[in-house]
Amino acid sequence: MDLWRVFLTLALAVSSDMFPGSGATPATLGKASPVLQRINPSLRESSSGKPRFTKCRSPELETFSCYWTEGDDHNLKVPGSIQLYYARRIAHEWTPEWKECPDYVSAGANSCYFNSSYTSIWIPYCIKLTTNGDLLDEKCFTVDEIVQPDPPIGLNWTLLNISLPGIRGDIQVSWQPPPSADVLKGWIILEYEIQYKEVNETKWKTMSPIWSTSVPLYSLRLDKEHEVRVRSRQRSFEKYSEFSEVLRVTFPQMDTLAACEEDFRFPWFLIIIFGIFGVAVMLFVVIFSKQQRIKMLILPPVPVPKIKGIDPDLLKEGKLEEVNTILGIHDNYKPDFYNDDSWVEFIELDIDDADEKTEESDTDRLLSDDQEKSAGILGAKDDDSGRTSCYDPDILDTDFHTSDMCDGTSEFAQPQKLKAEADLLCLDQKNLKNSPYDASLGSLHPSITLTMEDKPQPLLGSETESTHQLPSTPMSSPVSLANIDFYAQVSDITPAGGVVLSPGQKIKAGLAQGNTQLEVAAPCQENYSMNSAYFCESDAKKCIAAAPHMEATTCVKPSFNQEDIYITTESLTTTARMSETADTAPDAEPVPDYTTVHTVKSPRGLILNATALPLPDKKKFLSSCGYVSTDQLNKIMQ
């Protein structure tokens, strides 16, 4: 509803301006709402044409003044035609007496001045305007409510510092409180508001109210002129005083180049935008061109199995047998099993079990006919479960060939015949058990340990048949039993890794005790089992040492016609020296000679290094390589 009245009032005002001679306008404005008159006092003045109060102010809370307008009536413009009356309320009651204004001149025209004699603080005042007894306007207030101090005076500024580039500077603005306000005694407390701007600007920059009379202004451009103004008000009140005079701040002349640099602002924002866009484009191009490589870096493929000499397709197809075959061919892929091998403390000879007695033993095949022995030696069986065996045909070929070259001979014999003849060198110990020479043999072979499986095997033919066939052989009286061990016990291991062997023989404990028929044979005709390519040292010693003690009629010297069977010269040297001292000390045991493995000539053959003793002068050996032939052995035995 009020909005319609506002619009109506505005329309009437415009019409009054357009038609100044109209007499209906004052009557209409007189009916306007008092709310509109409070909103716009000028409307109230123009509506009635009567004088109205404009303001009342006290600059220092000790005196105050009130002001009014003249009005439209020319008769009221005559001095003294309008009177101001005031009254004070004491003890919550108005005095019945109204008093006229004490001073119409000191505050100016159309005003009334109340000095300190007529001013009372915290006491309400009521004032009214009258002309010829008619009430024109009235107003009520207290002095503390109308306090409006004078503007500050004495504005000044001081330069604090200048920035390093010489573009901006800091100043401090100071002023004095209005002289009318008794600020020093604390009768009134003022606060100040500062406004500043550049000369060419239209909008003032306002700072927060402060209580002090100085304030710093920062970052003012040195190439611009600035304006500063200040106004004051009583603390906790809303009415400010008028602004002080404008203070102009002009800095000294500065470098033009610095001003140009300040005016030029680098477009950092645009550069950042274009930079981000360019980096995004470059990343997109790189990712698009290198997408395969980036994919491999992020998700690397599973590596293809690459083994030298093996087709990867075999692994993909799962053909493990072919892969294992290829790995077995290449030496680099073969596993090293030698680290898992354990040391062998002593060597055992595995003889066939009792249920295999029907089969012929290797030694019996050797003692049979040449045709049978040659056929049997090819079928020799090595059933030692991985341990070294004396029944090794490969050693015969290698060792005999080496000894032939050392002796300067070039005879080559069949391995079957050589093993058969070498086997005839050692006689059966069972038939010599009751002979005088039996004790000496037992004392010479204490170092070989026989296994529980060592059992005597029957000969290829019967004992009777073999007895009748003995005279036709080169040896005089071979014995049927040939299960005599020619193994050497390992006694020590050298720091360099060599194996030290202890030679010797021990008569088997499981020999049959019931044989009464003894064959007469010379001690040098023992049935040596020549299943290896060398003579045992202890056997050679027994043949040499026992020869002087036997009767000439019963001793048939062995004739070693096998030119490819050898024994070591060191062993013969030792046994020869022992045979010389047999007369003086017939019961003394020869000191066993220890030897070491010199080298491996074949997968199952060994060459031994024996401890050699000085040879007697009367025994001259033609071979210097450590082996002698059967001819040389015959000469030594003579």
From Swiss-Prot:
GO terms for biological process: cartilage development involved in endochondral bone morphogenesis; cell surface receptor signaling pathway via JAK-STAT; cellular response to hormone stimulus; cellular response to insulin stimulus; cytokine-mediated signaling pathway; endocytosis; growth hormone receptor signaling pathway; growth hormone receptor signaling pathway via JAK-STAT. The modification Phosphoserine is found at S342. Changing F346A: No internalization nor down-regulation. No effect on transcriptional signaling. Pfam families: EpoR_lig-bind (PF09067), GHBP (PF12772). Residues 357-389 are annotated as: Disordered. Residues 19-265 are extracellular. Glycans are attached at N115, N156, N161, N200. Residues 151-254 form the Fibronectin type-III domain. Residues 363-373 have a biased composition (Basic and acidic residues). Residues 290-638 are cytoplasmic. Keywords: Cell membrane, Disulfide bond, Endocytosis, Glycoprotein, Membrane, Phosphoprotein, Receptor, Secreted, Signal, Transmembrane, Transmembrane helix, Ubl conjugation. A motif (WSXWS motif) lies at residues 240-244. Residues 1-18 form the signal peptide. PROSITE patterns: FN3, HEMATOPO_REC_L_F1. A motif (Box 1 motif) lies at residues 298-306. InterPro entries: FN3_dom, FN3_sf, GHBP, Growth/epo_recpt_lig-bind, Ig-like_fold, Long_hematopoietin_rcpt_CS. It is a single-pass type I membrane protein. Receptor for pituitary gland growth hormone involved in regulating postnatal body growth. On ligand binding, couples to, and activates the JAK2/STAT5 pathway. On growth hormone (GH) binding, forms homodimers and binds JAK2 via a box 1-containing domain. Belongs to the type I cytokine receptor family. Type 1 subfamily. The WSXWS motif appears to be necessary for proper protein folding and thereby efficient intracellular transport and cell-surface receptor binding. This is Growth hormone receptor. It comes from Rattus norvegicus (Rat).
